């Protein structure tokens, strides 16, 4: 049974939200594109340092049944479902003013990075070196070595934020967002999850 019927429809989301400890990034509080290269490299360094502890918290908090295999594809889906539930409270134009949505985006990105590292040991957080024309310019990316402007990386934070916003506007399901994620993973990392 998938996570006990989706954690009894996300464990009554308000109960989840009250107990969930937000992730607070330790990097400078400014948008990534406005950071200097040194500031972005520091943000990436801090993400790498924080990933293990945050993944352990998420696995325990969500009572994942995947055990030492956490995070699995089902775990990533669960985080997307929580993000969607969070967004449904306010609508895509407002995001989630509580901060839960943005914390879940970070947790999703950490878990996505760890998930990909199980398949490829050359995947890690990197400071973007894509061009200014790229939507991933000057951002922390989950990437393989020698990635290109258009291929070889995923912006885990932006994937979570943009895909869920778009899914609400287009009235798509989380299952469809998962299909997008699998496609992006196959295209960028040559990992077939179908």
Question: Language-model segments: what does each one mean?
Answer:
Residues 98-148:
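Amphipathic, interaction-prone secondary-structure segments
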Residues 47, 58-62, 125, 142, ...:
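Generic hydrophobic, helix-prone segments enriched in Leu/Val/Ile
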Residues 15, 40, 118, 152-153:
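Short linear sequence motifs
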Residues 81-84, 113, 117, 165:
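Alpha-helical repeat scaffolds in large eukaryotic proteins
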Residues 1-98, 187-194:
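The feature captures two recurrent sequence modes
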């Amino acid at each position: 049974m998938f996570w006990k019927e989706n954690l009894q429809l996300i464990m009554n989301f308000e109960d989840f939200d009250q107990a969930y400890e937000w992730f607070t990034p330790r990097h400078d509080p400014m948008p990534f594109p406005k950071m200097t290269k040194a500031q972005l490299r520091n943000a990436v360094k801090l993400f790498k340092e924080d990933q293990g502890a945050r993944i352990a918290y998420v696995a325990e908090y969500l009572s994942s049944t995947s055990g030492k295999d956490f995070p699995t594809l089902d775990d990533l889906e669960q985080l997307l479902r929580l993000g969607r539930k969070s967004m449904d409270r306010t609508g895509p134009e407002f995001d989630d003013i509580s901060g839960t949505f943005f914390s879940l985006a970070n947790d999703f990105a950490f878990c996505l990075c760890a998930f990909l590292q199980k398949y490829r040991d050359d995947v890690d957080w990197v400071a973007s070196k894509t061009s200014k024309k790229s939507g991933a310019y000057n951002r922390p990316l989950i990437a393989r070595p020698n990635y290109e402007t258009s291929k070889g990386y995923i912006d885990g934070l932006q994937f979570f934020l943009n895909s869920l916003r778009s899914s609400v506007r287009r009235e798509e399901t989380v299952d469809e967002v998962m299909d997008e994620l699998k496609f992006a993973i196959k295209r960028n990392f040559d990992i077939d999850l179908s």
